[in-house]
Amino acid sequence: MPKVKALQCALALEIRSVTCPGVVLKDKEDIYLSICVFGQYKKTQCVPATFPLVFNARMVFEKVFPEAVDPGDVVAQLEYDTAVFELIQLVPPVGETLSTYDENTRDFMFPGPNQMSGHHDSNRQVTMRRISGLRGIAPKLEFSTTSVITECLISSRKCRTQDKFTYHSAPVEKSHGRLQCRTSRSQKKKSKSPERSKYCINTKNYEQPTISSKSHSPSPYTKRRMCELSEDTRRRLAHLNLGPYEFKKETDKPPFVIRHVDPPSPRTDNFFGSPGRDCERDGWVRMHSDHPHIGCCRSKDYKVIRSPHGRDFEDPFERCEEYLSPRTCSKPQHSARTLLVHSAPSTTPKHCASPVLNRASLRERFHSDWCSPPNCDEIHDRVKDVLKSHQAHARHLCDERDPEREDELELKRSLLYRDSAYDSDPEYSSFQRPRGSFHLDDGECWSNRAASCKGKSHRPVFENSMDKMYRNLYKKACSSVSHTQESF
């Protein structure tokens, strides 16, 4: 492949020390200096965090300008490049930059006379810019540079890939013997294969991770923040495989669920049929299980209520009407109107003592067995017979007959259709009836002797007393309503 002529610029940089009198760093981690020239990153060895920082490091930066025809073109192109120095301390998680210094590469490589400390001395001193974490005076960097522009021969393919790689093909002549030794070694590398030389050239670029990034594992928040850095920083931290990260809002989390229902037992499945088919056909209510640590705080599971139309009973008053509606004692609990599925109580130990979580739900407390349904129906029938009877309405609204006569008639009616039923019931047999005396509503004392003399049992007298109490309550309610209407 034919070779073409090109100009190569070589920079020999020798870093001596960084001084900052009177400044003590709060962190004791090691410090190193990072340098970027010609787009190539290099770094010094780590030194203890005590000023002055003595590095005594020597570095060589080389770059080929294939399109330049004279040194003036090279100098003109150097104006578009910047030399950057960063003083970095290995503070977790990714290191902390203490101070920086940046200058145009042309002025950095070819300083003016006023930037030199002496006529025969090549040492230079520049003041670095402090970052907010460093207090006191600004650090001062002491270094020396040697720059050479030479002509070299490179292939046309290397000309096209010059922006990615750096080549060591031309000698760098200087009075110092160190550069000549490096030139002789670089000439020996010409005989190596192209694949191996390409690998060696890639290692010259600053593609290796920094020391601080190797010694620490960044947190997820640090990873997301590091993705917002510049492209140069992305290239330096490419080994972390950060990828595209985005900040997520807290509202993206799934809602917090408390209710929990255990799967039905096999016995229940056999009684009600297949759970999968029943869910599709009858519309069972499905409830999502909550987090495992929430289920431990539940005293017992909830009940699932299903109607034949596939809707839930959400209104507690509708459930109250169903419980208070008349029904017989022989009616099964699993009726056609309502189906109650009681899941097994949770066997998980209780770790939470909160009364709010241990308390049963409103629906469960409402449907608890504080009294059996037959007793509720019986009480409801008696109250409804008293309040909705034609005799009670006529007596309190229209009739002005004697109250004592009405009491006797009501007592006879009650004896006709109630006394026989309760006397035949073994629950209210003679040996189970109360044998002590008690006071009635009108001040009369009733006992077993009075019952034997008058020929009345305790049950009719008790019912008669209850009827009087309900009539008085109804009369008071009607009078209060009439007074309210008159006031309006």
Curated annotation (Swiss-Prot):
Keyword Kinase among record annotations: no
GO biological process: cell differentiation; motile cilium assembly; spermatogenesis
Sites of the Glycyl lysine isopeptide (Lys-Gly) (interchain with G-Cter in SUMO2) crosslink: 248
Phosphoserine, modified sites: 217, 219, 265, 274, 325, 343, 346, 354, 424, 465, 487
Deletion phenotype: Male are sterile due to disruption of sperm connecting piece formation, leading to acephalic spermatozoa in the epididymis and ejaculates.
Keywords, comma-separated and alphabetical: Cell projection, Cilium, Developmental protein, Differentiation, Flagellum, Isopeptide bond, Phosphoprotein, Secreted, Signal, Spermatogenesis, Ubl conjugation
Pfam family, one: SPATA6
Secreted as UniProt keyword: yes
Stretches for region Disordered: 176-225
Biased composition (Polar residues): 200-220
Extent of the signal sequence: 1-17
Domain of life of the organism encoding this protein: Eukaryota
Gene Ontology MF term list: myosin light chain binding
This protein's GO CC annotations: extracellular region; motile cilium; sperm head-tail coupling apparatus
Tissue expression notes: Specifically expressed in developing spermatids and mature spermatozoa (at protein level). Isoform 1 is weakly expressed in testis, ovary, thymus and placenta. Isoform 2 and isoform 3 are testis-specific. Expression isw higher in spermatids than in spermatocytes and spermatogonia.
Quaternary structure note: Interacts with MYL6.
Summary of the function given for this chain in its UniProt record: Required for formation of the sperm connecting piece during spermiogenesis. Sperm connecting piece is essential for linking the developing flagellum to the head during late spermiogenesis. May be involved in myosin-based microfilament transport through interaction with myosin subunits.
Homology family: Belongs to the SPATA6 family.
Name of the protein this chain belongs to: Spermatogenesis-associated protein 6
Species: Mus musculus (Mouse)
